[in-house]
């Protein structure tokens, strides 16, 4: 009987461990977040590489985070895209808009590295210019973005390596380079946000 209970307990612990493999939680001051927190952040000069054209924009966001079932979760409810320009003299940016908000987010690990994965990402850029091949064309980018989280700086970075590590992609982009800041706006204001 004792052996049977030991085997059952071992199997249960193994299944819980497997279910939480790759799971991480949000932390402030090395303690797991209890309840929820509002986070804001931004990046200047985010580089979006599409076939034949590089577009640079500033992004800012607002997100609510929590730990759900011992896993970091979040909802990106606000995204502003501004100050966009291209590397082409012929092409300008007429407008840029985030769509289908909120976007869901969660934390994960690949090896020993923590990542923020944002799902349901969708934004559009309207290009202009008489000699621009994309002039008066609304280009929509959509998909899932995985960014490497830096616990010492409280930032997450989207780049080719982070997309590859997380198996994520944004349709229409060959590369997205951006390092987003994080800042708590509620009871944890002034504290460094960690993911682990």
Question: What function would you assign to each model-found segment?
Answer:
Residues 1-21:
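Secretory targeting and sorting signals
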Residues 11, 16, 33-35, 110, ...:
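Residue-level detector of solvent-exposed, low-hydrophobicity positions
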Residues 21-80, 164-196:
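N-terminal segment immediately downstream of the Sec signal-peptide cleavage site
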Residues 26, 121, 139, 154-156, ...:
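Short non-domain terminal segments
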Residues 53-152:
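Predominantly extracellular/secreted and cell-surface proteins with exposed
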Residues 142-170:
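Extracytosolic low-complexity repeat regions of secreted or lipid-anchored proteins
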